[in-house]
Amino acid sequence: MKRISAVMGITAALAAGALVVAGCSSQGGRVASSDDDSSGGTSKGSGLTIALVTHAAPGDTFWDIVRKGAEDAAKKDGVKLLYASDPDGSKQAQLVQQYTDQNVDGIAVSLAKPDALKSSVQAAEKAGIPVVSFNSGSDAYSALGILAHFGQDESVAGEAVGNELEKQGLSKPICVIQEQGNVALEARCGGIKKVLPDTETLYVNGTDNSAVQSTVTAKLQADSDADVVVGLGAPYTAVILKAVKAAGSDIKVASFDLNASLAKSIKSGDVLFTVDQQPFMQGYESIDSIVLYKQGGFVLGGGKPTLTGPAIVDSSNIGKVLQYAEDGLR
């Protein structure tokens, strides 16, 4: 493979659900029943119950990959995995509190809105429940007393995109944020802007794809200076591609994250490249790290985030990656 250029060294995984607890969505794109539990059916189990709590919005299939990693780890370790999600920070905090009240053995939580989650996370820790974070919150987790974090540095990922765009002669991106106030998404656009100062941020309602498309279409029709539009998630980049077509624009498209559809768009040339944070690893390591902590007091990362990305995926390496994307691993 020519490259899956890990812009920062990716820490190797040391090995990677579902009770819905009042979340507006049991997960991203896949719908689960109210008592869906993914313990994996192993005969030799750790006997642990671990909750995975994300900020997934309904229909966002990115989180299916995170959950796949968590489920595989749970199956390997004989863990009963509980899952719930809500994109609203205060409601996500309520989910954490409900799992604390259930006295689970561990909680893995995404920290898109750390201020909203602070009290519930610290309540879990006070109750003696180990908490790890993943995906969002690499700059916030340690201040909350969280044991470990698995994800990518979103500012560095943004800079990687900016550098890649600059290499291709592009200098005026539109960075489309689908969830205002999400610290990870803001950091991505901030990283791009650090490299390319003419970057413009466009906020859209990520819970309504038709609204996303119409907002981006209108922006493209009104803005003739932009030379590339950047989606901050694979499902949203798919909508952006529709908006580009509807606007009759020849603007370039780049992305963050990956799924099978986006992989095919990179292969076809419709999307220049994406930055993959390898969400399967985030889910897998989050569950496995809690098991390791419970069984031996092990803590990964040495006080630093365990990095799962960023890795550039483009035409040079998509042939290798596409197979894994189609299998739901990338």
Question: Which residues are covered by each model-predicted region?
Answer:
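Flexible loop/hinge segments that line or gate small-molecule binding clefts
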Residues: 115-156, 259-267, 271-272, 322-324
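Short, solvent-exposed amphipathic alpha-helices that sit
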Residues: 61-77, 157-161, 183-199, 215, ...
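Hydrophobic alpha-helical
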Residues: 93, 109-125, 192, 206-264
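Bacterial lipoprotein signal-peptidase II cleavage site
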Residues: 21-42
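Secretory targeting and sorting signals
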Residues: 1-28
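Extracytoplasmic "Venus flytrap"
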Residues: 43, 47-73, 77, 82-98, ...
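Hinge/cleft segment of the Venus flytrap/periplasmic-binding protein
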Residues: 46, 195-199, 284-330
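Hydrophobic alpha-helical segments within soluble ligand-binding/sensing domains
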Residues: 92, 149-173, 211-213, 259-262, ...
